[in-house]
């Protein structure tokens, strides 16, 4: 009967498991650094790898508009107007004109009225821009929209 050693037993008892000297298979120093070390702009160690697998890793690409030029509109939802009604009235942002309550979004520094939430009062809304959904809800509450 042939008794064959299992492959699992290979290299048992060997100090180095085929790596020669113990130092050769020790830390990151034998591999050119750990992970992606050495792939920086000086492009020495792993440059061939970088060119093949990560060509966009270094250098700039695209364009970013300066923050000063970017326009992000200031917005307010209908539910915010409804919840802070008294606060706006005290501040003079909501005032009475010809027997109607007027909400002046331009005085608040808001550019756009959004349609999230409900409006429970009839308001005349002055704004630079009102979304169609918001306009629909304002009119349903008995108010009107005036674009500034």
From Swiss-Prot:
GO biological process: translation
InterPro entries hit by this protein: Rbsml_uL15_N (IPR027386), Ribosomal_uL15 (IPR030878), Ribosomal_uL15/eL18 (IPR021131), Ribosomal_uL15/eL18_sf (IPR036227), Ribosomal_uL15_CS (IPR001196)
Keyword list, A-Z: Ribonucleoprotein, Ribosomal protein, RNA-binding, rRNA-binding
Region listing for Disordered, in residue ranges: 1-43
Signal sequence coordinates: none
Compositional bias annotation for Gly residues: 29-38
Pfam family, one: Ribosomal_L27A
GO MF: rRNA binding; structural constituent of ribosome
Bias type Basic residues, positions: 1-28
Taxonomy, superkingdom: Archaea
One GO term describing the cellular component: cytosolic large ribosomal subunit
Entry keyword annotation includes Zinc-finger: no
UniProt cross-references to PROSITE patterns, sorted A to Z: RIBOSOMAL_L15 (PS00475)
Biological function: Binds to the 23S rRNA.
Subunit structure, as described in the record: Part of the 50S ribosomal subunit.
HAMAP family linked to this entry: Ribosomal_uL15
Family from the record: Belongs to the universal ribosomal protein uL15 family.
Stated name of the protein: Large ribosomal subunit protein uL15
Annotated organism of origin: Thermococcus kodakarensis (strain ATCC BAA-918 / JCM 12380 / KOD1) (Pyrococcus kodakaraensis (strain KOD1))
Gene name, Swiss-Prot/TrEMBL: rpl15
